[in-house]
Amino acid sequence: MPVSQSWWQVEVHCDPLLEDLLYWRLSEAGGRGFVCESKAQGLQVHSYFPAELWEETIRDRLLQEINADAADLGLPTPSLSWQTLDEEDWSESWKRHWQPQELGDRFLIQPAWLEPEPSDRLLLQLDPGTAFGTGAHPTTQLCLEGLETVPVADKVIADVGCGSGILAIGALLLGAKQVYAVDTDPLAVGATQANAALNDLEGDRFWTAIGSADQLQPLHAQGVRFDGFLCNILAHIIQALTPTLSELASPGSWAIFSGLLTSQADTVSVTLEEYGWVIRDRASQGDWCRLVADFRPER
């Protein structure tokens, strides 16, 4: 494959206080995966864009947005640079930057290409490929921590916007009976399937499909009862999917919502409550927020 048809590595140097907003801007622009390193001069963030998404208009808009964010916070102007990578270089670049990571009280996120060290934690092996979700992003961390607070064992769970599959696999490692994972990005679904195989979780317990929550409706019509939902997606998508999720839920179902900024949490909460969800926990990391909600339509 020609270099021009593969990947762009985008590198941003910025003040550490800009980290959370920068993750959000890169996600919205189409970035796949994030690597963050602390440097003496500040923060260095790498993200990876498919070649077709790194157009001049996207570059210009992203630069304007992050410069405006820095100005609003009174921070130095970030620097933005990029270079092309072929598939092999992309993979090797990713692997150089990513190391094992303990998350929550129970998980150890393990790069699949490294030999795991002995640990009493739940080993979650991962090769994210081009999909979002390594455990490095605050919203992924918040969701995994949230999973430790809800009933998972022997439950049926849906992961809407599964990315690399990290949350779906986490649920299975915690003893979920079945997990149904969907994503509108075919590359993400492929990564989820591959990561399930890495963790020996193929079979009847794990189901994937390309699409969104609408892919779960036929299953619900056939009698599948969803006990929990994982939604690490952007705020406006959570709001748009709330009616469908409410149709799929049963009284007592729970949901974990992240991918939203703390400044968006109140607006998202209002939408959820209009459709019968009760927010029982709210946590944040930097500018990012997680909501845990229970479905109680007959309050």
UniProtKB/Swiss-Prot annotation:
Q: Does the keyword Protein biosynthesis apply?
A: no
Q: What is its EC number?
A: 2.1.1.-
InterPro entries listed in its UniProt record: Ribosomal_L11_MeTrfase_PrmA, Ribosomal_PrmA_MeTrfase, SAM-dependent_MTases_sf
The entry marks the following residues as binding S-adenosyl-L-methionine, namely 140, 161, 183, 232
Gene3D superfamilies listed in its UniProt record: Vaccinia Virus protein VP39 (3.40.50.150)
Q: Which UniProt keywords apply?
A: Cytoplasm, Methyltransferase, S-adenosyl-L-methionine, Transferase
Which is a GO BP term held by this UniProt record?
methylation
| A cellular component term, taken from the record's GO annotations | cytoplasm
Known SUPFAM superfamilies for this protein? Answer: S-adenosyl-L-methionine-dependent methyltransferases
Q: Name one GO molecular function term.
A: protein-lysine N-methyltransferase activity
Which CDD domains did the record assign? AdoMet_MTases
Q: Which reaction equations make up its catalytic activity? A: L-lysyl-[protein] + 3 S-adenosyl-L-methionine = N(6),N(6),N(6)-trimethyl-L-lysyl-[protein] + 3 S-adenosyl-L-homocysteine + 3 H(+)
Please give the superkingdom of this protein's source.
Bacteria
Q: What class of enzyme is it?
A: transferase
**Listed PANTHER family:** ELECTRON TRANSFER FLAVOPROTEIN BETA SUBUNIT LYSINE METHYLTRANSFERASE
Q: What does this protein do?
A: Methylates ribosomal protein L11.
The family this protein is said to belong to:
Belongs to the methyltransferase superfamily. PrmA family.
Name it. Ribosomal protein L11 methyltransferase
Recorded source organism is Synechococcus elongatus (strain ATCC 33912 / PCC 7942 / FACHB-805) (Anacystis nidulans R2)
